[in-house]
Swiss-Prot record:
GO BP annotation list: L-histidine biosynthetic process
GO cellular component labels: cytoplasm
Subunit structure: Equilibrium between an active dimeric form, an inactive hexameric form and higher aggregates. Interconversion between the various forms is largely reversible and is influenced by the natural substrates and inhibitors of the enzyme.
UniProt-recorded name of the protein: ATP phosphoribosyltransferase
Principal EC category: transferase
Stored InterPro entries: ATP-PRT_HisG_long, ATP_PRibTrfase_cat, ATP_PRibTrfase_CS, ATP_PRibTrfase_HisG, HisG_C, N-reg_PII-like_a/b, N-reg_PII/ATP_PRibTrfase_C
Lineage: Bacteria, Pseudomonadati, Pseudomonadota, Gammaproteobacteria, Enterobacterales
Catalytic activity: 1-(5-phospho-beta-D-ribosyl)-ATP + diphosphate = 5-phospho-alpha-D-ribose 1-diphosphate + ATP
EC number(s) on file: 2.4.2.17
A Pfam family reported for this protein in Swiss-Prot or TrEMBL: HisG
Its job: Catalyzes the condensation of ATP and 5-phosphoribose 1-diphosphate to form N'-(5'-phosphoribosyl)-ATP (PR-ATP). Has a crucial role in the pathway because the rate of histidine biosynthesis seems to be controlled primarily by regulation of HisG enzymatic activity.
Length: 299
């Protein structure tokens, strides 16, 4: 019998978002064994169940109220939303926040030896895709008619196999397209992972747990986007040094024993510190510059 007091979260069992989703949950302090073949895993330290399913099942599980939360790519979520609307449904859910992983783009690609004069080049052509609704919305907005060839995998082989004239598929680096004699010609949708919540009344205990998780997720993402920086900086150029390192708060300044010309400076910077920035700090007279990762952060 299902325990309705436990928070149910759906995530991809294996694939593009699986490892990052697992890492996010672990860094939020959820102790759970996700290395087994079980489809439902129970957290050891929180009333949370993790459902490990196919990524294209996650939006439906949330929209139908089977699970409370889902970690899903925006591309899969939007495709399911358009699919349900096309069937006359009114799907409901909340997007709690965009996450900092799973970045990709849904793009049109054509054979490298064919001319490309913009989307109108696809008028009347057959296009292979796993995202027919996103493709249709984009080309309808352009006033372009086309024939759709629905494939659930290996979309990139369609032109060589004579199944389609072009494809619409996810692209990360473009290496797979190149290996199949294709080139990316148009980006139609940019996507990242996101966290969504089912619509409807939520038990107070569950909502409190969701609120706690949201604070932790914010801390994890903020920590990944920030660095802890320590250095010795000349007092006369302190303002210039601080200007190079944007942060949420002012830095901590500490005196150096026996040195009136320099101070020790500690701060959290919200920007990734590149070599160019470190070279500028060095040119201002800073020394002993240390840049450290942050595991957890809460403002």
């Amino acid at each position: 019998m299902t325990d309705n007091t436990r928070l149910r979260i759906a995530m991809q069992k294996s694939g593009r978002l699986s490892d990052d989703s697992r890492e996010l949950l672990a860094r939020c302090g959820i102790k759970i064994n996700l290395h087994t073949q079980r489809l439902i895993a129970m957290a050891e330290n929180m009333p949370i169940d993790i459902l490990r399913v196919r990524d294209d099942d996650i939006p439906g599980l949330v929209m139908d109220g089977v699970v409370d939360l889902g970690i899903i790519g925006e591309n899969v979520l939007e495709e399911e939303l358009l699919n349900r609307r096309a069937q006359g449904e009114d799907p409901r859910y909340f997007t709690l926040r965009r996450l900092d992983f799973g970045g990709c783009r849904l793009s049109l690609a054509t054979p490298v030896d064919e001319a490309w004069d913009g989307p109108l080049s696809l008028n009347g052509k057959r296009i292979a895709t796993s995202y027919p609704h996103l493709l249709k919305r984009y080309l309808d907005q352009k006033g372009i008619s086309f024939k759709s060839c629905l494939l659930n995998g290996s979309v990139e082989v369609a032109p060589r196999a004579g199944l389609a004239d072009a494809i619409c598929d996810l692209v990360s680096t473009g290496a797979t397209l190149e290996a199949n004699g294709l080139r990316e010609v148009e980006v139609i949708y940019r996507s990242k992972a996101c966290l969504i919540q089912r619509d409807g009344e939520m038990e107070e205990s569950k909502q409190q747990l969701i609120d706690k998780l949201m604070i932790r997720i914010q801390g994890v993402i903020q920590a990944r986007e920030s660095k802890y920086i320590m250095m010795h900086a000349p007092t006369e150029r302190l303002d210039e040094v601080i200007a190079l390192l944007p942060g949420a708060e002012r830095p901590t300044i500490l005196p150096l024993a026996g040195d009136q010309q320099r101070v020790a400076m500690h701060m959290v910077s919200s920007e990734t510190l590149f070599w160019e920035t470190m070279e500028k700090l060095k040119a201002l007279g800073a020394s002993s510059i240390l840049v450290l990762p942050i595991e957890k952060m809460m403002e």
